[in-house]
From Swiss-Prot:
Stored SUPFAM superfamilies: Ribosomal protein S6
Organism in which the protein naturally occurs: Ureaplasma parvum serovar 3 (strain ATCC 700970)
Name of the gene: rpsF
Record keyword RNA-binding present: yes
Keywords: Ribonucleoprotein, Ribosomal protein, RNA-binding, rRNA-binding
The protein's name: Small ribosomal subunit protein bS6
Keyword Ribosomal protein listed: yes
Length: 160
């Protein structure tokens, strides 16, 4: 079952009974779901005006469902209803924000990537040490033969 969270913002100029009625009508579309949590935040001041309104009722529903058509129906009814100022539906199973740090598949994938990057870094450092040792040996040979010695180029990634 997929986990979802819905936030519903209802007009603040309605009285509480009307706002609850609007929210309950929309919640009724989620009939075959396991509602885990209902939060009613009451009338709150909006950060900015929406349709010339400064206050709104906020409802948050957390639930689980396998039927995506219920989510689509909820979205359709929320858009049609003029008393709903805003709504957002979030699939909590997907990796948004901090959820990516909790998702075991993503955590395992990131750990594997970190291991690969650590091995690549160790290999690059080992090759750099080998290059430095080869340079020192070449330098000693050339000095013994009386030939000029070139400077060691540390950045071997640059194209010459």
């Amino acid at each position: 079952m997929a986990k979802y969270e819905i936030m519903l913002v209802v007009r603040g100029d309605l009285d509480q009974e009307q706002a609850n009625k609007v929210a309950n009508e929309l919640k009724a579309t989620l009939k075959n779901t396991e509602v885990k949590e209902n939060n009613y935040d009451g009338v709150q001041q909006l950060a900015y005006e929406i349709n010339k309104l400064k206050t709104a009722y906020r409802y948050v529903y957390n639930f689980e469902t396998t039927d995506v058509s219920l989510i689509n129906e909820f979205r359709r009814l929320a858009i049609i209803n003029k008393n709903v100022l805003r709504h957002i539906i979030i699939n909590l199973e997907k990796d948004y924000g901090y959820k990516a740090t909790v998702n075991t598949k993503k955590v395992q994938r990131n750990e594997k990537r970190a291991e690969v990057y650590a091995r690549q870094k160790e290999e690059a450092e080992r090759r750099a040490v080998e290059r430095q040792a080869a340079y020192e040996a070449m330098k000693a040979e050339r000095e013994a033969a009386g030939l000029p010695v070139k400077e060691f180029v540390k950045n071997t990634n640059s194209k010459r």
